[in-house]
């Protein structure tokens, strides 16, 4: 059985990147929540 995590920089950026977050209303809510909490990095 293969491992489930097959890293890809492109896929990571496209699904979890800053622009992906900004593209949807809920994504912007995520960023706002992370700013409110005082996260050092908004995008992991």
Curated annotation (Swiss-Prot):
InterPro entries: Ribosomal_bL34, Ribosomal_bL34_CS
Top-level division of the source organism's lineage: Bacteria
UniProt protein name: Large ribosomal subunit protein bL34
Species classification: Bacteria, Pseudomonadati, Pseudomonadota, Alphaproteobacteria, Magnetococcales
GO terms, biological process: translation
Keywords, ordered alphabetically: Ribonucleoprotein, Ribosomal protein
Native source species: Magnetococcus marinus (strain ATCC BAA-1437 / JCM 17883 / MC-1)
An annotated GO cellular component: ribonucleoprotein complex
Membership in a protein family: Belongs to the bacterial ribosomal protein bL34 family.
